[in-house]
Amino acid sequence: MTEQRIIASSSTREDDAADASIRPKRLADYLGQQPVREQMEIYIQAAKARGEAMDHVLIFGPPGLGKTTLSHVIANELGVSLRVTSGPVIEKAGDLAALLTNLQPHDVLFIDEIHRLSPVVEEVLYPAMEDFQIDIMIGDGPAARSIKIDLPPFTLIGATTRAGLLTAPLRDRFGIVQRLEFYSPQELTRIVSRSAAILGIDCTPEGAAEIARRARGTPRIANRLLRRVRDYAQVKAAGHIDLPVAQAAMQMLKVDPEGFDELDRRMLRTIVEHFDGGPVGVESLAASLSEERGTLEDVIEPYLIQQGFLIRTARGRMVTPKAYLHLGLKVPRERAPGIGEPGDLF
């Protein structure tokens, strides 16, 4: 089983505690995702002008990009309360009914991992989203009866990293659908600088940029790396983070300039050295790495593919010439004739 990685995009308890102090409250402070931000500003202003609950919102994209943060921002901009839960927590229809009946008019209900709702719970959610009503069964057997309960108008925000797992009936009930994209290094630099200022960390623009470029396009990773570099700087550099300090801290953490850690590099190296660069089936690759298939597909591969180091084909996984160069290896002539010489890893 893979231990928690410093560049993992999944949330930890430390992330949750730290995020609470640096989480933006307004759209103006929500950096990056400009198309989403501009659209949401219009939808929010229109709903407030009409005095109505905003339409239901589905937010999807890779983990760590700010889906939960955006839900908090939306509720703050609407001036309403936010109730937060997740799909696995809502086990029974009664659990969902309890949440819905406690909402005030125009409140926002945020359901993380909404793709993990059970079919029974989804059936209760459909009329709640469409008609602001739910049907609850009271009693058992022949004495059972259905009671219709009216709900106040509310906005449901569903978040998921696996939009393809949503059922069509549920997906179709969202009037607003937003995809969050990976952040650019420039956007992440602004996020790191903002977080450093809020946390009272002495960080130069060059130090912030170095942290940002190794953060895999993900704010959660950028903020986590900032905290680890802060630890290093407090012990080794009197609390001051500049470019050399950030680079030295990343060397200690074994996070290279592409944002890869040892597990990323081990996967690329295994494909090159054991499978001649691929293609190799995911099951064989998982066995060679002593990792679960799900870990490869959901945790390791997405960023390698997105950055152009790995290709997923019908015959299996293949590395690209970029992977050879990144590992300091010469690219085989049959794969990319005339390509350059190997580069430095760090």
Swiss-Prot record:
The keyword DNA repair applies. GO terms for molecular function: ATP binding; ATP hydrolysis activity; four-way junction DNA binding; four-way junction helicase activity. It comes from the Bacteria. Residues 184-254 are annotated as: Small ATPAse domain (RuvB-S). GO terms for biological process: DNA recombination; DNA repair. Keywords: ATP-binding, Cytoplasm, DNA damage, DNA recombination, DNA repair, DNA-binding, Hydrolase, Nucleotide-binding. It is an enzyme of class 3 (hydrolase). Residues 257-346 are annotated as: Head domain (RuvB-H). Gene3D superfamilies: 1.10.8.60, P-loop containing nucleotide triphosphate hydrolases (3.40.50.300), Winged helix-like DNA-binding domain superfamily/Winged helix DNA-binding domain (1.10.10.10). It catalyses: ATP + H2O = ADP + phosphate + H(+). Residues 1-183 are annotated as: Large ATPase domain (RuvB-L). Its EC number is 3.6.4.-. It is found in: Cytoplasm. The keyword Repeat does not apply. Its main location: cytoplasm. Mg(2+) binds at residue 68. Belongs to the RuvB family. The RuvA-RuvB-RuvC complex processes Holliday junction (HJ) DNA during genetic recombination and DNA repair, while the RuvA-RuvB complex plays an important role in the rescue of blocked DNA replication forks via replication fork reversal (RFR). RuvA specifically binds to HJ cruciform DNA, conferring on it an open structure. The RuvB hexamer acts as an ATP-dependent pump, pulling dsDNA into and through the RuvAB complex. RuvB forms 2 homohexamers on either side of HJ DNA bound by 1 or 2 RuvA tetramers; 4 subunits per hexamer contact DNA at a time. Homohexamer. Forms an RuvA(8)-RuvB(12)-Holliday junction (HJ) complex. HJ DNA is sandwiched between 2 RuvA tetramers; dsDNA enters through RuvA and exits via RuvB. An RuvB hexamer assembles on each DNA strand where it exits the tetramer. Each RuvB hexamer is contacted by two RuvA subunits (via domain III) on 2 adjacent RuvB subunits; this complex drives branch migration. In the full resolvosome a probable DNA-RuvA(4)-RuvB(12)-RuvC(2) complex forms which resolves the HJ. Has 3 domains, the large (RuvB-L) and small ATPase (RuvB-S) domains and the C-terminal head (RuvB-H) domain. The head domain binds DNA, while the ATPase domains jointly bind ATP, ADP or are empty depending on the state of the subunit in the translocation cycle. During a single DNA translocation step the structure of each domain remains the same, but their relative positions change. HAMAP family: DNA_HJ_migration_RuvB. NCBIfam families: PRK00080.1 (NF000868), ruvB (TIGR00635). This is Holliday junction branch migration complex subunit RuvB. It comes from Xanthomonas euvesicatoria pv. vesicatoria (strain 85-10) (Xanthomonas campestris pv. vesicatoria).
